[in-house]
Amino acid sequence: NLYQFKNMIQCTTKRSVLEFMEYGCYC
């Protein structure tokens, strides 16, 4: 799903990569 993918990219720029890998993206 393209929207989810774009949202994921926006999240990873705001959050640390390690945090993203552990918890996933909840925006």
From Swiss-Prot:
Question: Does tRNA-binding appear among the keywords?
Answer: no
Please describe the organ and tissue distribution of this protein's expression: Expressed by the venom gland.
Q: Which GO terms describe its molecular function?
A: calcium ion binding; phospholipase A2 activity; toxin activity
User: What does the UniProt keyword field contain?
Assistant: Calcium, Hydrolase, Lipid degradation, Lipid metabolism, Neurotoxin, Presynaptic neurotoxin, Secreted, Toxin
Per its UniProt record, the required cofactor names are: Ca(2+)
The catalysed reaction is: a 1,2-diacyl-sn-glycero-3-phosphocholine + H2O = a 1-acyl-sn-glycero-3-phosphocholine + a fatty acid + H(+)
Q: Write out the annotated subcellular location.
A: Secreted
Top enzyme class? hydrolase
Q: Which GO terms of the cellular component aspect does the record hold?
A: extracellular region
Q: State the EC number(s).
A: 3.1.1.4
User: Where does this chain mainly localize?
Assistant: secreted
What does the Swiss-Prot or TrEMBL cofactor note state? Binds 1 Ca(2+) ion.
Alphabetical list of InterPro entries matching this protein: PLipase_A2, PLipase_A2_dom_sf
Q: One biological-process term from Gene Ontology?
A: arachidonate secretion
Q: Which family does it belong to?
A: Belongs to the phospholipase A2 family. Group I subfamily.
**What does the function comment of this entry state?**
Snake venom phospholipase A2 (PLA2) that inhibits neuromuscular transmission by blocking acetylcholine release from the nerve termini. PLA2 catalyzes the calcium-dependent hydrolysis of the 2-acyl groups in 3-sn-phosphoglycerides.
The protein's name is: Phospholipase A2 1
Q: What species does this protein belong to?
A: Micrurus nigrocinctus
